[in-house]
């Protein structure tokens, strides 16, 4: 939350686990991003990972007295921020993230830190480590419905032709 109210920014993130089993999430954003001004050392933060989600039509239930809804799965990482402003640490953060995302490339891109333009760009970002204190899983996939409604919903999602809806059907646990 900033002075102008709640803020949300979609960021590149990387989950890391140390030898003791502690999770942290490395992330970065532009210093010019208004959200960066409200993020500080020791502040609490939440990283949201939205999973499969989608509109659920009342037509898809066996019972006909329903309204539309939204089914979803999500995971929240809740923790404390540590600001990363040191150039060397920022370069390591970018390197780790790049290595992870370029892993499948035939000729993976690597930062040339001797290039002044690339170095200037890394100094235009601010990094953070979110030390995860707890994880929360959230899901709403029809688990509160009757077995008949769940089976009907699952069948309609599977037959939708939409890969996202078909995956949502796989997330459902039918009684």
PLM feature spans:
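A short, structural micro-pattern
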Residues: 7, 21, 41-42, 69-73, ...
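An N-terminal domain-start capping segment
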Residues: 25-47, 158-163, 170-173
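C-terminal edge-of-domain segments
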Residues: 82-175
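A general structural signal for short secondary-structure junctions and capping/turn motifs
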Residues: 17, 37-39, 118-123
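Beta-strand secondary-structure signal
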Residues: 26, 46, 78, 127-131
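Short loop segments at secondary-structure junctions
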Residues: 18, 52, 80, 133-135
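Short beta-strand segments
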Residues: 1-31
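Short, structured beta-strand-loop surface elements
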Residues: 31-93
């Amino acid at each position: 939350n900033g002075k102008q109210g709640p803020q949300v920014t979609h960021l590149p993130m990387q989950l890391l686990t140390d030898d003791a089993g502690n999770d942290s999430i490395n992330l970065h954003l532009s210093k010019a991003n208004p959200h960066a001004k409200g993020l500080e050392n020791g502040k609490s933060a939440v990283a949201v990972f939205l999973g499969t989600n989608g509109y659920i039509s009342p037509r898809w239930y066996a019972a006909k007295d329903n309204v539309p809804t939204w089914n979803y799965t999500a995971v929240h990482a809740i923790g404390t921020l540590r600001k990363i402003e040191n150039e060397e640490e920022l370069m390591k953060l970018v390197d780790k993230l790049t290595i992870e995302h370029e892993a499948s490339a035939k000729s993976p891109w690597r930062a040339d830190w001797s290039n002044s333009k690339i170095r200037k760009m890394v100094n235009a970002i601010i990094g953070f480590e979110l030390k995860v204190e707890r994880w929360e899983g959230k899901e709403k996939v029809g688990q509160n419905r009757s077995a008949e409604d769940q089976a009907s919903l699952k069948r309609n999602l599977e037959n939708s032709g939409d890969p996202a809806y078909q995956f949502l059907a796989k997330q459902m646990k039918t009684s």
